[in-house]
Amino acid sequence: MSDTFEPIRIVALYHFTPFEDPAALRGPLLELCEKEGIKGILLLAREGINGTIAGTDEGMERVMAHIRALPGCADLESKDSRAPELPFRRMKVRLKKEIVTMGEPDIDPRQGVGRYVAPEDWNALISDPDTILIDTRNDYEVAIGTFKGAEDPKTKSFREFPEWFRRRRQELEAKGRLPKIAMFCTGGIRCEKSTSFARAEGVDEVYHLKGGILKYLETVPEEESLWEGECFVFDQRVSVKHGLEIGTHDVCHACRRPLNEKDKASPLFVQGVSCPHCHNERTEEQRHRYAERERQEALAQARRAGHLGVRQK
């Protein structure tokens, strides 16, 4: 991590626990977040809570105490990092059917998941030639970084993962292989469902990285790491590197995909409007709408900067 003081605390969290009435939890949680100046997004569903929030240490302490006091959440999984400024612009608490959408209603991680592997033990597992390593994230996330030797399912959404996994398993069985399966994702939540799904499909020897990529990058020294590239994150940092340092990628405000310097040098890149990944996916009307949104946001930022300048005189 950076030696420079970074005043903002960022917490990525999730927990599978039964909420009888998620809607009743939403109001008090949102009210407290707004009172404490917390920004980010939290998802509530009958199966639990998931999200990433950021704010001052004092505000985050109070909000995290509230979250841990929710039914069954005393031991929720969370990962801390720091930033020089808020990586979110607003606070949202949304009600969902699932806190991570897989589209397999019978899968319940509370009934069993794969075997957790600590970051410091991960290298040994994935270096074993009898281990199949699977990245459970979407294609645009995998594109900017993954573990050496990992299989990329090339999914556009997590809903596509079950079908891909069934096909891949059939391919392995046709070759007479029954390898160990190791899965990983950004913070661990997708692997709670993907390994639970694998077990429901009859796979016994399935493992997943405890704390996800973020915990690995925080824990394992870069010189010992088998991670290649950067890790996409769903906030204004866009990507992080070893030690959870902010990465080098920007994001396309039209499609939310990460962009490197080559992408931004493309003639198809227009700030806030299009990029090489989405230019052919958008209509002229959509691009016009994005351009207007970008203009309005620039005006709003200029007004905020001017207001701050007056206050500092």
UniProtKB/Swiss-Prot annotation:
Positions annotated as active site in the UniProt record: C185 (cysteine persulfide intermediate)
In terms of PROSITE patterns, this protein maps to:
RHODANESE_3 (PS50206)
The answer to whether keyword Lipid metabolism applies is: no
Where's the Rhodanese domain?
127-225
Entry-linked Gene3D superfamilies: 3.30.70.100, Rhodanese-like domain
Q: Its catalytic activity?
A: uridine(34) in tRNA + AH2 + O2 = 5-hydroxyuridine(34) in tRNA + A + H2O
- Could you tell me the EC number(s) of this protein? 1.14.-.-
Q: Which domain of life is it from?
A: Bacteria
Q: Does the keyword Transferase apply?
A: no
Spans through the membrane: none
GO BP annotation list: tRNA modification
Q: What class of enzyme is it?
A: oxidoreductase
Q: Which GO terms describe its molecular function?
A: oxidoreductase activity, acting on paired donors, with incorporation or reduction of molecular oxygen
Q: Which keywords appear in this protein's UniProt record, sorted alphabetically?
A: Oxidoreductase, tRNA processing
Role, per record: Catalyzes oxygen-dependent 5-hydroxyuridine (ho5U) modification at position 34 in tRNAs.
Per the record, the similarity remark reads: Belongs to the TrhO family.
What's the name of the protein?
tRNA uridine(34) hydroxylase
Q: Which organism is it from?
A: Gluconobacter oxydans (strain 621H) (Gluconobacter suboxydans)
| Phylogenetic placement of the source organism | Bacteria, Pseudomonadati, Pseudomonadota, Alphaproteobacteria, Acetobacterales
